[in-house]
């Protein structure tokens, strides 16, 4: 949001970056001549600017910056639970499905996965230029001296971290993994996915030096590195096979002469209509690709467990020589990969970095980065935006904690209930801010004392549980492998044959079970009640339905905690810490029927 962006900022990726790195301010310059660039590339610019955000965004374009929460692709539930269902001490807490427009994430540059070339040109730092020349000389004259995990900037104080990878061929893309076995540990799988995303940068270095601090550019020199997630063929298939609606699922836009226009007609986005807009210079944005693409669904659902925050995606297709979106910024962390074609960055200030993204390359930039991009004249551009950590800050957590702490303090501490001084209006307020009055000093000291004591009443764990429930409401459901599906409720072969039910589910006390994913469920206290929240009934459309938590008897809570803490190991139903065997089976059946747990072997039998 605008109030979170400082006056001084550094720009990155055709964007101005929310500056947390000291450096010179930015000056607006005229447009520069676009250098010759090869086919199938995407050029982006990282630049500096002294102009205020509103001037940088409105001065030329006349459009406001777009916050990530207004543009983020969405993923979530469609089904509703049964109202008032009771099951041996358990009942469903239900509410009607909430209809909500999909959120959208800014522009084609924000976060993307794709194919492209990155050509860097960092200005304003002789040390960086000297380092680049040295690295190029080493690479050409002494290739054996290259670092095994890439060549990095010689100066960590540069506005953008640049890394060249020579080991990408040795890394298997998760998009090409065979979908047969099971996810033994979803935490490890999520970590592997993120390591693949930022390879060859080590995750420890990424979070200590780059995360929320500065952009990262990785050149991999391997076009196939990002293959398998999405393609123009996938987009065509989605348009033909699904009810894609203009405005809700897809936008067609242009940005010319400083004016951004959305050209969405009402109704379904039929392929012939979409491609006609495209032929006439419109950019195409698919807002929720995870709803229709198995690959994007898997990418987002895996990474959301790594970040403990919603991960969204947008697809952007831009015709040659055009631009679809005005400069803007988003309140999310963004990862950019180019899939097809090229993208260039229009000059909007002194360049910190001019980049040409090639297939397989990565560009990360922190929240607050102002960005815009356009396709080069010789080819189209296709990329995916992957974004995370929206409304997932310390401030967002404190919004929940502070009101609850005040309520408790009012109840338990008499000083919070004492009246304000009868004459405090005489020396407090803006009109009295410069008064040298001892009463004013005493007032502020009392307030500071109360604020320091307020910390003692903060219900941290309860507040974190509320954040966890919000996260689960935003989550995508997990992607089941073939084996997992066979061992879950979704693989049961229960059916009616000749008037007789066969293939019923059979869980015994000896059956080994485990959670489908570590983050698939959350046990939460709400007043005197205990609820089990889960994401298994979430839809792949954002907020397609409300969560359907299960109210469980308090005595069942230790057994659920036992299952959670045992992950990723299988445990037998008999090992549940409950007094009666039937209670163990009832709890296991309830969680199995909701998809929260899976058995080690297929659980349905023909009877």
From Swiss-Prot:
Residues 39-58 have a biased composition (Basic residues). The keyword Phosphoprotein does not apply. Residues 188-405 form the JmjC domain. Residues 25-37 have a biased composition (Polar residues). One of its GO terms (biological process) is negative regulation of DNA-templated transcription. Belongs to the ROX family. NO66 subfamily. This is Bifunctional lysine-specific demethylase and histidyl-hydroxylase NO66. Keywords: Chromatin regulator, Dioxygenase, Iron, Metal-binding, Nucleus, Oxidoreductase, Repressor, Transcription, Transcription regulation. GO terms for molecular function: 2-oxoglutarate-dependent dioxygenase activity; histone H3K36 demethylase activity; histone H3K36me/H3K36me2 demethylase activity; histone H3K4 demethylase activity; histone H3K4me/H3K4me2/H3K4me3 demethylase activity; iron ion binding; peptidyl-histidine dioxygenase activity. It catalyses: L-histidyl-[protein] + 2-oxoglutarate + O2 = (3S)-3-hydroxy-L-histidyl-[protein] + succinate + CO2; N(6),N(6)-dimethyl-L-lysyl(36)-[histone H3] + 2 2-oxoglutarate + 2 O2 = L-lysyl(36)-[histone H3] + 2 formaldehyde + 2 succinate + 2 CO2. It is found in: Nucleus. Residues 156-167 have a biased composition (Basic and acidic residues). Oxygenase that can act as both a histone lysine demethylase and a ribosomal histidine hydroxylase. Specifically demethylates 'Lys-4' (H3K4me) and 'Lys-36' (H3K36me) of histone H3, thereby playing a central role in histone code. Also catalyzes the hydroxylation of 60S ribosomal protein L8.
């Amino acid at each position: 949001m605008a109030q979170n962006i400082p006056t001084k900022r550094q720009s990155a990726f055709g964007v101005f970056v929310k500056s947390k790195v000291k450096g010179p301010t930015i000056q607006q310059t005229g447009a520069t001549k676009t250098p010759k660039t090869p086919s199938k590339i995407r050029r982006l610019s990282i630049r500096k600017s002294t102009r205020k955000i509103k001037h940088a965004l409105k001065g030329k374009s006349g459009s406001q910056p777009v916050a990530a929460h207004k543009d983020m692709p969405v993923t979530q539930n469609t089904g509703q639970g049964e109202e008032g269902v009771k099951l041996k001490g358990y009942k469903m807490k239900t509410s009607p499905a909430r209809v909500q427009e999909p959120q959208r994430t800014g522009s084609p540059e924000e976060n993307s996965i794709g194919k492209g070339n990155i050509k860097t040109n960092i200005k304003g730092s002789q040390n960086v230029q000297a380092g680049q020349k040295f690295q190029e000389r080493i690479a050409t004259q002494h290739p054996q001296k290259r670092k095994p995990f890439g060549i990095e900037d010689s100066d960590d104080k540069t506005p953008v971290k640049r890394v060249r990878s020579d080991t990408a061929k040795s890394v298997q893309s998760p998009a090409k993994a065979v979908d047969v076995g099971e996810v033994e540990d979803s935490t490890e799988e999520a970590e592997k996915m993120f390591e693949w995303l930022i390879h060859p940068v080590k995750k420890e270095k990424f979070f200590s030096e780059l995360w929320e601090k500065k952009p990262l550019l990785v050149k991999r020199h391997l076009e196939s590195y990002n293959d398998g997630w999405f393609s123009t063929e996938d987009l065509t298939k989605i348009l033909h096979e699904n009810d894609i609606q203009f405005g809700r699922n897809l936008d067609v836009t242009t940005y010319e002469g400083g004016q951004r226009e959305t050209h969405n007609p009402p109704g379904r986005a039929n392929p012939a209509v979409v491609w006609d807009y495209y032929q006439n210079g419109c950019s195409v944005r698919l807002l929720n690709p995870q709803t229709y693409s198995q690959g994007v669904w898997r990418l987002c659902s895996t990474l959301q467990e790594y970040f403990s925050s919603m991960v969204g995606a947008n697809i952007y297709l831009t015709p040659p020589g055009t631009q679809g979106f005005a400069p803007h910024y988003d309140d999310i962390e963004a990862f950019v990969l180019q899939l097809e074609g090229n993208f260039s960055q229009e000059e909007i200030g002194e360049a910190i970095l001019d980049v040409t993204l090639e297939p397989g390359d990565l560009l990360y930039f922190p929240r607050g980065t102002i960005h815009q991009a356009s396709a080069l004249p010789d080819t189209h551009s296709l990329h995916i935006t992957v974004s995370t950590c929206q409304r997932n800050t310390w401030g967002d957590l404190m919004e929940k904690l502070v009101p609850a702490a005040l309520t408790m303090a009012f109840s338990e501490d008499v000083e919070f209930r004492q009246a304000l001084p009868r004459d405090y209006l005489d020396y407090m307020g803006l009109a009295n801010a410069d008064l040298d009055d001892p009463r004013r000093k005493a007032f502020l000291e009392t307030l500071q004392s109360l604020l320091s004591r307020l910390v003692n009443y903060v219900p941290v764990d309860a507040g974190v549980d509320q954040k966890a429930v919000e996260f689960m409401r935003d989550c995508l459901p997990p992607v089941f492998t073939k084996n997992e599906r066979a061992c879950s409720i979704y693989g049961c072969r229960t059916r009616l044959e000749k008037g007789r039910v066969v293939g019923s589910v059979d869980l015994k006390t000896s059956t080994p079970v485990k959670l489908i994913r570590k983050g698939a469920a959350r046990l939460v206290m709400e007043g005197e009640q205990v609820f089990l929240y889960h994401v298994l009934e979430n839809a792949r459309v954002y907020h397609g339905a409300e969560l359907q938590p299960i109210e469980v008897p308090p005595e069942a809570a230790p057994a659920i905690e036992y299952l959670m803490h045992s992950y990723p190991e299988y445990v037998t139903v008999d090992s549940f810490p409950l007094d009666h065997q039937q209670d163990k089976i009832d709890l296991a059946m309830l969680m199995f029927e909701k998809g929260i747990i899976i058995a080690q072997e297929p659980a349905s039998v023909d009877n």
